[in-house]
Regions:
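S-adenosyl-L-methionine-dependent methyltransferase catalytic module, highlighting the catalytic core
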Residues: 125-126, 136, 140-141, 149-275
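N-terminal, positively charged/glycine-rich alpha-helical extensions of SAM-dependent methyltransferases
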Residues: 2-41
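Conserved alpha-helix/loop element of class I SAM-dependent methyltransferases that forms part
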Residues: 47-69
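Class I SAM-dependent methyltransferase SAM/SAH-binding core
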Residues: 80-127
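N-terminal targeting leaders
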Residues: 17-33, 87, 117-119, 138-139, ...
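Conserved class I S-adenosyl-L-methionine
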Residues: 69-77
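Short amphipathic alpha-helix with an adjacent loop that forms part of the alpha/beta core around
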Residues: 62-63, 127-134
């Protein structure tokens, strides 16, 4: 899953271990097909991705101390965010993605780190079952939302396994609305009120960055309202360029229950929306 992050603030330092003397770093880095994330794996040594995990967690205000917390990392990719949570003291981390851990480089990184509290779960955000994976104090939902064909369903599913806070980061279209002619414009350049109206821009092919995995670009208000409609209380934490970070906790009104779909036992059973 893609995300681009510019630093906004510094996170308190966590304990980064020295590189084991018996580890072949060159072999490790070459064994991974694609390094997506940049993270200080050992003191002074960074994975060769371009997306800074440190900046992402800082912009999202993920606590430096996660002692005793149970964490779900949705769209984990290389696993760097999950392993950073382990470093910050989380008691258990479930790293979720669609591909195999070998394809993503997760297995190689886990072995190099000698991690014992992070486990990989191959699956989809659309099928989060608390009876299978439990519930979580912290859910990381970074660079995923705009890659989803069914974003509201995904947020409903996050609510099922949440007992704490969702930290979410996504593309937003407030500063990057794709206009006719494939030019990007500020949403407010069309009308100042549009940033206050929940909007989702649909990408039917690869209009955004030449990537067929991009489906919907929300504006900030749409993200807030989507979480609220799932029974979560959401807030904007930071915005930089065409990215924004949010936090959401349980406590809002579940408007899904008041809809025709929400009132349908068939729909709620088939989609497992029994929160």
């Amino acid at each position: 899953m893609a995300f681009d992050v510019a630093p906004r603030m510094s996170s308190p330092a966590t304990s980064t271990p020295p590189c084991p003397g018996d580890l072949d770093l060159k072999a490790l880095f070459q064994s991974v097909p694609h390094w997506h994330q940049r993270w200080e794996i050992f003191q002074g040594i960074f994975t060769p991705g371009r997306n800074s995990v440190e900046a992402l967690l800082a912009n999202s205000e993920v606590p430096a101390d996660l002692t005793g917390k149970r964490v779900l990392d949705v769209g984990t990719f290389n696993g760097c965010c999950a392993f950073e949570c382990e470093r910050r003291g989380a008691s258990e981390i479930v790293a979720l993605d669609l591909q195999t851990p070998e394809e993503l480089g997760f297995t190689a990184l886990k072995a190099a780190l000698r991690s014992n509290r992070v486990r990989f779960h191959r699956g989809s955000v659309y099928h989060l079952d608390p009876e299978e994976i439990g519930t979580f104090d912290v859910i990381l939902f970074f660079g995923v939302l705009y890659h989803l064909r069914y974003p509201l369903l995904a947020i409903d599913q996050l609510r099922r396994v949440l007992r704490g806070t969702v930290y979410s980061e996504t593309l937003v279209i407030d500063e990057r609305f794709l206009a006719e002619g494939k030019d990007f414009q500020r949403l407010s350049s069309y009308h100042s009120a549009l940033t206050q109206v929940p909007l989702w821009q649909f990408y039917k092919a690869n209009e955004l960055a030449g990537d067929y995995s991009n489906w919907f670009g929300p504006n900030i208000q749409a993200v807030l309202d989507a979480f609220e409609s799932a029974g979560l209380s959401a807030s904007l934490i930071s915005q930089w360029g065409d990215r924004a970070a949010f936090q959401a906790v349980a406590g809002g009104a579940d408007t899904m229950r008041q809809s025709y779909e929400g009132a349908s036992e068939i729909v709620r059973t088939e989609l497992a929306l029994g929160h």
